[in-house]
């Protein structure tokens, strides 16, 4: 199954999405801000990114723009 990176500063949302995806058989990787998401993407294979738009440090839009410079993976913005 696919590796899915879930990124949101709200840990409850990350956990809820993660539980659902894991029940469906996906491997879930968790990040809690845009900087952490970029670091994860540089260090391990990810097939899909689900990212929140409003986060501290680096918001979802700016993180997505930086990620797109290096990685063409599919992204779902919440």
What does each model-identified segment do?
Residues 55:
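Receiver (REC) domain active-site loop signature in two-component systems and cognate sites
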Residues 11-29, 43:
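Two-component/phosphorelay signaling modules centered on CheY-like receiver
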Residues 32-36, 59-62:
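Acidic catalytic/metal-coordinating carboxylates
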Residues 8, 52:
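Active-site residues of response regulator receiver
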Residues 1-5:
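Non-catalytic signal-transmission and effector/linker regions of two-component phosphorelay proteins
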Residues 39, 61-73:
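Short amphipathic alpha-helix used as the core "switch/output" element in two-component signaling
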Residues 44-50:
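Active-site beta3 strand of CheY-like receiver
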């Amino acid at each position: 199954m696919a590796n899915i990176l879930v990124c949101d500063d709200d840990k409850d949302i990350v956990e809820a999405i993660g539980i659902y995806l894991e029940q469906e058989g996906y491997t879930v990787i968790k990040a809690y801000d845009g900087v952490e998401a970029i670091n994860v993407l540089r260090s391990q294979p990810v097939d899909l990114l689900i990212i929140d738009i409003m986060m501290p440090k680096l918001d979802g839009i700016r993180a997505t723009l930086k990620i797109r410079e290096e990685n063409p993976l599919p992204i779902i913005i919440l």
